[in-house]
Amino acid sequence: MASGVGAAFEELPHDGTCDECEPDEAPGAEEVCRECGFCYCRRHAEAHRQKFLSHHLAEYVHGAQAWTPPADGEGAGKEEAEVKVEQEREIESEAGEESESEEESESEEESETEEESEDESDEESEEDSEEEMEDEQESEAEEDNQEEGESEAEGETEAESEFDPEIEMEAERVAKRKCPDHGLDLSTYCQEDRQLICVLCPVIGAHQGHQLSTLDEAFEELRSKDSGGLKAAMIELVERLKFKSSDPKVTRDQMKMFIQQEFKKVQKVIADEEQKALHLVDIQEAMATAHVTEILADIQSHMDRLMTQMAQAKEQLDTSNESAEPKAEGDEEGPSGASEEEDT
């Protein structure tokens, strides 16, 4: 192994082994550095070449001079330069490692941030899709409910129009205001049958020869009749019940039968009063209908007179216009003829 580098030492012959390996286990040298003069095996030569890029290694030849020691100043300066270069490389390598580690950490943080943003966007998209689905379901449910409500409303209106009791009653009232035999308005009252009839019933109908009256006369007559029959019947019923209940000979069954008979009499009086009231209502409705019919007839007659007067006025206006046209033509020809005579 070589030793002594510098002016104080003489160059010793190399022993032909690697100066980097352990002396006891050092293999044979294969390359030698021309700058530092050390001999290396294949492995250490490659490491020395990568560590000191400015050094030049050559094949080791046993017995040849491996290295010429430079001057003291030159060697020291070269060694200092090599050390400085090595330190700079180490600093650069450390800075590169730090920058790489920082870049890796930044890239990891960016990737984590991107993953978090992707997760958040996925969650937001899922929430949005769920909200859209819920909105669609709600809108569909509202549309279905609206359609059902419309169909129900239509069904109700149809049902009301078909089964509305007020409409049916109005139709019945309108039908009652017409004569069932002749289809005319009920404008006369038959005293014998106590019935409303039309004007044709006493002429060609079933009421020929009967005593008749107007609707106003029949209404006043029915309304002026004494309506105390119901009150008198109730008073008589109370008196008879008192007398019957005070008789000790009357059994319980006889008392029940008596009460039923008396109440049937009262019910008949009530039914007669009901028919009388309904009859008055019918006569009043017939009077109103006849009155409206008279008013409509008067309006129609007035309209007919107005239309006739308008037609006559238009005819007179047309006649006056026709008579005025020839006169205007003659006036125009007169001055022209006079001017022609003057010219001649």
Swiss-Prot record:
Which SUPFAM superfamilies does the record cross-reference, listed alphabetically? B-box zinc-binding domain
Q: Where is the composition biased (Acidic residues)?
A: 93-165, 330-344
Spans through the membrane: none
Q: Which UniProt keywords apply?
A: Coiled coil, Metal-binding, Phosphoprotein, Zinc, Zinc-finger
Give the compositionally biased regions (Basic and acidic residues).
75-92
Q: Give the span(s) annotated as Disordered.
A: 1-25, 68-165, 309-344
Does the record carry Cell division as a key word?
no
Coiled-coil residues: 290-325
Q: What is this protein called?
A: Tripartite motif-containing protein 44
* Source species: Pongo abelii
